[in-house]
Amino acid sequence: MTKILTVTFLVLTLFILTLFPAYPQGQADFRVMSYNVENLFDTDDDPLTADNDFLPDGNRHWTGGRLYHKLQQLAKVITAAGEWSTPAVVGLCEVENDSVLVRLLRSTPLRGQHYRYCMTHGEDTRGINVAFLYQRDKFRYAGHAEHPVRFTRKSHKRTRNILHVWGEVMTGERLDVFVCHFPSRYGGEKESEAGRADAARTLRLLCDSVHALCPSPHILVIGDFNDTPDNASMRDILHARPLPAVRSSVPGSMPVRFPPDTDLSLLLYNLFAGGRHNPPGSHKYQGEWSQLDQIIISSSLADTTSSMHLVPGSARTFSPPFLLVRDKSWRGERPFRTYYGFKYEGGYSDHLPVIADFRLSVGP
């Protein structure tokens, strides 16, 4: 039965991809962006989730005007992050539902960028999901699925599902993307780490399942992991390690030496592991920066001889001046948030986005 389902899946994917015209030849850049957009809710009550704070008469007085302003702000960030052109694909965290995504893509300057989207519809108690935006001329969508995190201790616990999207890039190769928002640190980092370990374990199984179908897959993992690259969930369970120095995209990273018998095709590389960053993180809490938002790639995308590969030095936290404000409680700057506690600031998000570039060689 498993073999039949696998063959059927591959045949359907190939059929969908044949419906699209061929890409133009030459070289092309492919920018990836990941952004936790801080509570992108609509103004309607969902009786199945705890969204009462984000209603016109809720604690945060979330109105249609504030929603419209936030959508314009997010469109500005996505456009600016693309620099010369908007990112080819964008992963979003903390999105309530389809309604806000449709408005983002139709009621802002993004409406001319030909984005389409898919998203999860999970059972998170807060009612937030993850989403994936893609430009149709740069990514040929073939399908998507969402996967719940398998908790080992609290089987009844609910969090954001992991979104798996697959399709074809301009080289004609398949790209598998996972968009994640791991369980939060609410209640304490140590007290909550088991949930993130379970999420990392689920994600690793999903990556391994893709590898079982393809010996050298192009895998891209993006999102807010609520852990840093050095935490056990990322380093020891997901096994996402720093890039070897010869392929490193992070200035100052240390060389990584693998045992001779290591199967490099199974490795995942965290583009934000090791090295020095400016700013020193994507999220700031009580004066401390943490790199909670990350981009992780399979070894095939780190190989500069591949027809799709990482542009060395391109992975970074996107931090233009308009996304930052002076931190009055602590030193330096912090992200310009929509809310600071229950106080409305009218900013963008409590996270900064992360981006990375890939080079595509489109042959005849």
Language model regions located:
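Structured beta-strand-rich core segments of catalytic domains in phosphoester-bond hydrolases
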Residues: 37, 95-183
